[in-house]
Amino acid sequence: MAKGSTIKIGLKCSECGDINYSTTKNAKTNTEKLELKKFSPRLNKHTIHKEVKLKS
């Protein structure tokens, strides 16, 4: 059985440093790091969240 090309990633808040969201992405088709504007519950506002690797 072949190993899948999807990896687990977390989305870390650039202001407070918390990892608030986790998701998966295809590492072969999306080579650049993901950067999304998401809600940070600690700061109670929308901030930039950047991709970090999670332990699988």
Curated annotation (Swiss-Prot):
The keyword Transcription does not apply. PROSITE patterns: RIBOSOMAL_L33 (PS00582). Pfam families: Ribosomal_L33 (PF00471). Keywords: Ribonucleoprotein, Ribosomal protein. One of its GO terms (cellular component) is ribonucleoprotein complex. The keyword Disulfide bond does not apply. InterPro entries: Ribosomal_bL33 (IPR001705), Ribosomal_bL33_CS (IPR018264), Ribosomal_bL33_sf (IPR038584), Ribosomal_zn-bd (IPR011332). It comes from the Bacteria. GO terms for biological process: translation. Disulfide bonds: none annotated. GO terms for molecular function: structural constituent of ribosome. Belongs to the bacterial ribosomal protein bL33 family. This is Large ribosomal subunit protein bL33. The gene is rpmG.
